[in-house]
Regions:
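Divalent metal-cofactor coordination and adjacent catalytic microenvironments
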Residues: 1-196, 204-287
Length: 287
């Protein structure tokens, strides 16, 4: 089993300006370093939790479809069926396609009606529809690929002239979908007005190419009065507060302690166990 990120995240869950506010940094001399530390903290958080923070598109490659073992009727019951495909990155947003090489070597795409996706699982599972089995794939490495989108949020920009938002990421929404927003800027930062990160909104229209209009829960159109405070700071979807708080603490520690070792100094290291505990509610494991 191997994975390839086809469309990487279009940004980071926390913005450089939020880190600077948290660290009381008033100039831009270290912006480049802070940006790299944010990326490192995000990668560490994703490694620890097996979560995808910002939306990305992944391709899982298998040598064959999973099948029941020959002793399956007598095997110990398991919460995960032996014939299930397990998607390593969570939370799952959408299975884009399942493709395989048939016995003639031709690439085939499965009909979504032939399989069931359990996105509520962490990690998500895919099994054949009841009464069906996985197709027979060519017995060679990499014969099966599953393309899927995972993550919590994507950055967006606002066009105040036509009242549209443009989302930068692989995930799409349908008319009527309920969405929430958050901003990365720390105290004083505001989403593009009149959006409120404590409220939910509806997708009113989806012309295409990541462009949408919004309405409130009563169906009233959202008319934007400003475009927000810079790009990469407003997100559709919400990355959990605990993960973002952990990232801020991790970036702060790496920024203040720039060396791997301290030479010639008496150093007392005090562990703060609650810090990594911020990630505990979000940790997942692969069977």
């Amino acid at each position: 089993m191997s994975e390839l990120c086809l469309i990487p995240p279009a940004g980071e869950p926390i913005h450089v300006e939020e880190v600077k506010l948290d660290r009381r940094i008033i100039d831009s001399a270290d912006d480049g370093r802070i940006r790299s530390l944010v990326a490192a903290a995000r990668q560490h958080a994703e490694m620890q939790t097996r979560l995808q923070l910002l939306h990305a598109r992944w391709q899982l490659t298998l040598d064959a479809f999973p099948m029941y073992g020959c002793l399956a009727p007598f095997a110990r019951p398991s919460k995960i069926p032996e014939h299930a495909i397990i998607l390593p990155h969570s939370p799952l947003v959408k299975v884009v396609s399942i493709q395989y090489l048939d016995m003639s070597g031709a690439l085939q795409t499965m009909d979504p009606a032939d399989y069931v996706v359990k996105a509520s699982n962490t990690p998500a599972l895919i099994t054949p529809q009841f009464g069906k089995i996985w197709p027979i794939a060519l017995p060679e490495i990499g014969a099966v690929t599953v393309t899927y989108d995972a993550g919590y949020a994507s950055p967006f920009t606002v066009n105040t002239t036509n009242g549209q938002i443009t989302v930068n990421g692989p995930v799409t929404w349908n008319v009527g979908d309920r969405v929430q927003f958050y901003g990365s800027g720390g105290e004083g930062y505001k989403l593009p007005a009149p959006l409120d990160q404590d409220a939910s909104y509806l997708i009113a229209s989806a012309p295409g190419n990541g462009v949408y209009t919004l309405s409130d829960q009563a169906g009233n159109a959202i008319a934007f009065t400003d475009a927000g405070q810079g790009t990469g700071r407003a997100f559709i979807g919400v990355v959990p507060d605990g993960i973002r708080s952990w990232m801020l603490l991790r970036v702060g520690a790496m920024y203040e302690n720039r060396e791997e070792v301290a030479v010639g100094q008496r150093v007392v290291v005090l562990d703060l166990p609650y810090v990594d505990g911020l990630l505990d509610p979000f940790r997942t494991s692969l069977p």
